Curated annotation (Swiss-Prot):
Stated name of the protein: Putative N-acetylmannosamine-6-phosphate 2-epimerase
EC class (word): isomerase
Signal peptide segment: none
Cysteines joined through disulfide linkages: none
SUPFAM superfamilies documented for this protein: Ribulose-phoshate binding barrel
Pathway(s) of this molecule: Amino-sugar metabolism; N-acetylneuraminate degradation; D-fructose 6-phosphate from N-acetylneuraminate: step 3/5
Domain of life of the source: Bacteria
Protein's job: Converts N-acetylmannosamine-6-phosphate (ManNAc-6-P) to N-acetylglucosamine-6-phosphate (GlcNAc-6-P).
Protein keywords: Carbohydrate metabolism, Isomerase
Gene Ontology biological process: carbohydrate metabolic process; N-acetylmannosamine catabolic process; N-acetylneuraminate catabolic process
Family: Belongs to the NanE family.
Length: 234
């Protein structure tokens, strides 16, 4: 397992590259109760030249760590109904991820009501106080959410949840306007969400982002096949 990188070192490693999100949830074709599938996707991503991996769950992350030294952005998806945030939504999930010695922990930093009752700035401060050497990424959906997270001391702001909150911009593709605005504000942006093509990734890279995460367009074969099939129907 490699040493945990500094923010500067990680930004050097991520610059101009693609972070591949290797995830599958129950009910999806590539999900397996016994595991073993996500590390194969991560291995393929590494062989293609990916600069990092985004992964969900302690099991998947451990399996991926066993086959690659690429930096990992780790999350734990767990529902806390009736509240909507489910990506590393409480300190309990942060604790589990921190124990894995991964490069970055990503967490929901939207303004939606949280299970723990905290506002997002307070949650970020608590995590930073408990794990001062851990790099953190805020999954947000709007510029204001990104600004709040940045001002609270988050290391990276990800556009992961744009279009997935009812009040954010609803785009079929990536929220380029949000990515550009955050970059212009001097925030270290990890662009993520609905990036479907190499052309979109290139356009986003030219905005000066710190990193780019691509998931479904690479690691969800059902979604990829559906895109081809729908194109022939139109």
């Amino acid at each position: 397992m490699p040493d945990k990188p500094t923010k500067e070192k990680l930004m050097e490693q991520l610059k101009g590259g693609i972070i591949v999100s290797c995830q599958a949830l129950p009910g999806e074709p590539l999900y397996s109760e016994t595991g073993g599938i996500m590390p194969l996707l991560a291995k393929a991503a590494q062989e293609a030249g990916a600069v990092g991996i985004r992964a969900n769950s302690v099991r998947d992350i451990k399996e991926i760590q066993a086959i690659t030294d690429l930096p990992i952005i780790g999350i734990i998806k767990k529902d806390y109904p009736p509240q909507e945030p489910f990506i590393t939504a409480t300190m309990a999930e942060v604790d589990q991820l921190a124990a894995l010695n991964i490069a970055v922990i990503a967490m929901d930093c939207t303004k939606r009501d949280r299970h723990d009752g905290l506002d997002i700035a307070s949650f970020i401060r608590q995590v930073k106080e408990k794990y001062p050497n851990q790099l953190l990424m805020a999954d947000i959906s709007t510029f204001d959410e990104g600004l709040v997270a940045h001002q609270a001391g988050i290391d990276f702001v990800g556009t992961t949840l744009s279009g997935y909150t009812p009040y954010s911009r609803q785009e079929a593709g990536p929220d380029v306007a949000l990515i550009e605005a955050l970059c212009k504000a001097g925030i270290a942006v990890i662009a993520e969400g609905k990036i479907h093509s190499p052309e979109e990734a290139k356009k986003i890279n030219d905005l000066g982002v710190a990193g780019i995460v691509v998931g479904g367009a690479i690691t969800r074969p059902k979604e990829i096949a559906e895109r081809f099939i729908e194109a022939l129907k139109s």
